[in-house]
Amino acid sequence: MSKVYNWFNERLEIQSIADDVTSKYVPPHVNIFYCLGGITLTCFLVQVATGFAMTFYYRPTVTEAFASVQYIMTEVNFGWLIRSVHRWSASMMVLMMILHVFRVYLTGGFKKPRELTWVTGVILSVITVSFGVTGYSLPWDQVGYWAVKIVTGVPDAIPVIGGFVVELLRGSVGVGQPTLTRFYSLHTFVLPLLAAVFMLMHFLMIRKQGISGPL
């Protein structure tokens, strides 16, 4: 194993990267509340893993979505556990994200020179909520259907462009197959990609600037 490691280390300088990661200075005022962002990331990774597993069985059509979710829960080996963990970690992710935002705000972590870190964090918060809205509709049961109908109908109150925004969200005038397709695409591809990009930016800025000092 040492020969293999040395071979890679000569070409990629793995050891220097590992030393840089493990030797980063941690201020003495840091406590467990500074771990909330990391816990949020962990929940996101659990979401990715369990969500990916369910894509093998879920069918994003208005006629088969609900039945496919039932199939996952009752027929797929450990399907009930995978979906339950997905739901629990989703709730935990939202909770940890809210607590993380409060911690950063209360400790002044948004102040100069960390304004852009705060901005990317706010964007990630919006993405997290969007995950919840789009994921809620995917079982396409009564709760999911009416939730989508209400949420996508809210922009209708906007003057001039309201109708256009509603149709853009739904994919048609009413809520139906185009709506489910769009929400599925957002939930499984667009939002995870955006989350990954902004998380990378968020972490790189934290890495560069370090953790903010005490108030």
Curated annotation (Swiss-Prot):
TM segment ranges: 32-52, 90-110, 116-136, 186-206
Classification via InterPro entries: Cyt_b/b6_N, Cyt_B6_PetB, Cytb/b6-like_sf, Cytochrome_b_N_euk/bac, Di-haem_cyt_TM
GO BP, sorted A to Z: photosynthesis; respiratory electron transport chain
Names of required cofactors: heme b; heme c
Additional remarks: Heme 1 (or BH or b566) is high-potential and absorbs at about 566 nm, and heme 2 (or BL or b562) is low-potential and absorbs at about 562 nm.
Protein name in the entry: Cytochrome b6
Complex formation: The 4 large subunits of the cytochrome b6-f complex are cytochrome b6, subunit IV (17 kDa polypeptide, PetD), cytochrome f and the Rieske protein, while the 4 small subunits are PetG, PetL, PetM and PetN. The complex functions as a dimer.
Sites where the protein binds heme b 2: H86, H187
Keywords, comma-separated and alphabetical: Chloroplast, Electron transport, Heme, Iron, Membrane, Metal-binding, Photosynthesis, Plastid, Thylakoid, Transmembrane, Transmembrane helix, Transport
Residues binding heme c, per UniProt: C35
Binding site for heme b 1: H100, H202
Annotated Gene Ontology cellular component terms: chloroplast thylakoid membrane
Cofactor note: Binds 2 heme b groups non-covalently with two histidine residues as axial ligands. Binds one heme group covalently by a single cysteine link with no axial amino acid ligand. This heme was named heme ci.
Major subcellular location class: plastid
Compartments, as annotated in UniProt: Plastid, Chloroplast thylakoid membrane
